[in-house]
Amino acid sequence: MVKRADAGAIVAQLRVAIAPDDIAITLHHKLCHAARQLLEQTLPAIKHGNILEIAQRENEATCFGRRTPDDSFLEWHKPASVLHNMVRAVADPWPSAFSYVGNQKFTVWSSRVHPHASKAQPGSVISIAPLLIACGDGALEIVTGQAGDGITMQGSQLAQTLGLVQGSRLNSQPACTARRRTRVLILGVNGFIGNHLTERLLREDHYEVYGLDIGSDAISRFLNHPHFHFVEGDISIHSEWIEYHVKKCDVVLPLVAIATPIEYTRNPLRVFELDFEENLRIIRYCVKYRKRIIFPSTSEVYGMCSDKYFDEDHSNLIVGPVNKPRWIYSVSKQLLDRVIWAYGEKEGLQFTLFRPFNWMGPRLDNLNAARIGSSRAITQLILNLVEGSPIKLIDGGKQKRCFTDIRDGIEALYRIIENAGNRCDGEIINIGNPENEASIEELGKMLLASFEKHPLRHHFPPFAGFRVVESSSYYGKGYQDVEHRKPSIRNAHRCLDWEPKIDMQETIDETLDFFLRTVDLTDKPS
């Protein structure tokens, strides 16, 4: 036996079919019957030591947390099939699914999917008899339901009781609920993740974003937004402003960090001071004021782990010797992960750690940073193409990474902030795309192909070829590389109902297009 739920070896299994008409109570009876069968077969074998243990795939094992009322909201923008299955899952003996008409709560006890119903705004009443509600895809018929604490009745009777007519709108919360906007503090708001996350949050009407950074070029498009509040400054100087806003806000994302590999060997102490010491102070503010922190860990913490898939809960975190300063970023982040975890365990800090795996897209660094070598891979490669200099393949460019589109990454991060059912509390979540695995050499070739067919191609010099260079000559003697880095995204799927969707080629095309259109073409050949 092991202490974790749904972990350890399998000693007995029995498949239980879920029929289309099953609800929570009927499935419960099926599972009880199956459990009785298994115990009758297995307990004697355990007693006599005759069991055969089968190792399970730990990265596929799942468990679901305690049910909360949030699990029963009927969110009408979702597909009808999803809502129907939710009604089945939380029906008798549970309190069942619910929604509101104005301030009147009503419960749905049974439902039916109408996949080909006429299109209407999600949450709109399409018809009264049957009581048909438009969803994000298809429509849901409310077969039986209950108004408030009343009796269970047929859908058409429920519509009459609630005063519904064709075109009425349902909602997931009481209409009179005036919800204060959630205040989100983003330190490093002008950075790659910060500016894209700000855009996603401001797309909704229930977030107020407070940001600090040393520049504002990437967020200039938000500066006049009524729900965006920005101060230009350095986190090492503006400590009083930061403490005040940690106290004021609901969610804190300290995104400030030096995260470019060449800086790990070039300026290891600066990496430690900013990435560790400054962030530790912010973490302690969150503990002091009991604020939720969403902390950017990194895929770098896995280091030279040899697992096929890097798993948040099981993979070992392996780094090189002390005389390789390349690892100072990885261990700084790892120690902060452990500090946050300890504060959560011992002092009740509400936290989520997320680990990005090679996110890329528009506004990833800039070409000026790439000119001094202080940028991530794709931006450096684009600069080589723009300037007509050889693309440098460090140690042959055979290192493999899983590249993730910034839009996929931000959607996952947005869902962490939303934290439906508090499922993200105390979790470590990899955010990456295992399907987009490619070597740096392959990335370079895909980028080159996209560059050659770009409409602005004629403004730039001829391709200067690939050049293999040693990592020690490029990064310095304190560098070590990682051969592969592929995430398990089991936790992201379980906690966020998320999986990446965007193909790597699409990301490359859009990133290249963004940077080429930032280049001053007045001095370029035409």
UniProtKB/Swiss-Prot annotation:
Q: Indicate whether Transferase appears among the record's keywords.
A: yes
The UniProt annotation places UDP-alpha-D-glucuronate binding at 259, 264, 298-299, 326, 358, 392-401, 479
Q: Name one GO molecular function term.
A: carboxy-lyase activity
Region Formyltransferase ArnAFT, as annotated, extends over 1-170
Pathway the protein contributes to = Nucleotide-sugar biosynthesis; UDP-4-deoxy-4-formamido-beta-L-arabinose biosynthesis; UDP-4-deoxy-4-formamido-beta-L-arabinose from UDP-alpha-D-glucuronate: step 1/3; Nucleotide-sugar biosynthesis; UDP-4-deoxy-4-formamido-beta-L-arabinose biosynthesis; UDP-4-deoxy-4-formamido-beta-L-arabinose from UDP-alpha-D-glucuronate: step 3/3; Bacterial outer membrane biogenesis; lipopolysaccharide biosynthesis
Q: Which domain of life is it from?
A: Bacteria
Concerning InterPro entries, the annotation shows: Arna-like_SDR_e, Epimerase_deHydtase, Formyl_trans_C, Formyl_transf_N_sf, Formyl_transferase-like_C_sf, Lipid_A_modif_metabolic_enz, NAD(P)-bd_dom_sf
Binding-site residues, NAD(+):
D213, D234, I235
For the biological process aspect of GO, one term held by this record is: lipopolysaccharide biosynthetic process
The record lists (6R)-10-formyltetrahydrofolate as bound by: V2, K3, R4, A5, D6
> Which Gene Ontology cellular component annotation is one that this UniProt entry carries?
membrane
**Which controlled-vocabulary keywords does the entry list?**
Antibiotic resistance, Lipid A biosynthesis, Lipid biosynthesis, Lipid metabolism, Lipopolysaccharide biosynthesis, Multifunctional enzyme, NAD, Oxidoreductase, Transferase
Which reaction(s) does the protein catalyse, per the Swiss-Prot or TrEMBL entry?
A: UDP-alpha-D-glucuronate + NAD(+) = UDP-beta-L-threo-pentopyranos-4-ulose + CO2 + NADH; UDP-4-amino-4-deoxy-beta-L-arabinose + (6R)-10-formyltetrahydrofolate = UDP-4-deoxy-4-formamido-beta-L-arabinose + (6S)-5,6,7,8-tetrahydrofolate + H(+)
Q: Where is the active site?
A: E300 (proton acceptor), R485 (proton donor)
| Enzyme Commission identifier(s) | 2.1.2.13, 1.1.1.305
In this chain's numbering, which residues are marked as the site (Raises pKa of active site His)?
D6
Region annotated Dehydrogenase ArnADH sits at: 180-526
Which Gene3D superfamilies does the annotation name?
3.40.50.12230, NAD(P)-binding Rossmann-like Domain
| Quaternary structure, from the entry | Homohexamer, formed by a dimer of trimers.
Family membership noted in the UniProt record:
In the N-terminal section; belongs to the Fmt family. UDP-L-Ara4N formyltransferase subfamily. In the C-terminal section; belongs to the NAD(P)-dependent epimerase/dehydratase family. UDP-glucuronic acid decarboxylase subfamily.
* Known role: Bifunctional enzyme that catalyzes the oxidative decarboxylation of UDP-glucuronic acid (UDP-GlcUA) to UDP-4-keto-arabinose (UDP-Ara4O) and the addition of a formyl group to UDP-4-amino-4-deoxy-L-arabinose (UDP-L-Ara4N) to form UDP-L-4-formamido-arabinose (UDP-L-Ara4FN). The modified arabinose is attached to lipid A and is required for resistance to polymyxin and cationic antimicrobial peptides.
Descriptive protein name = Putative bifunctional polymyxin resistance protein ArnA
Q: Which organism is it from?
A: Shigella boydii serotype 18 (strain CDC 3083-94 / BS512)
Print the organism lineage: Bacteria, Pseudomonadati, Pseudomonadota, Gammaproteobacteria, Enterobacterales
Which gene is transcribed and translated to give this protein?
Answer: arnA
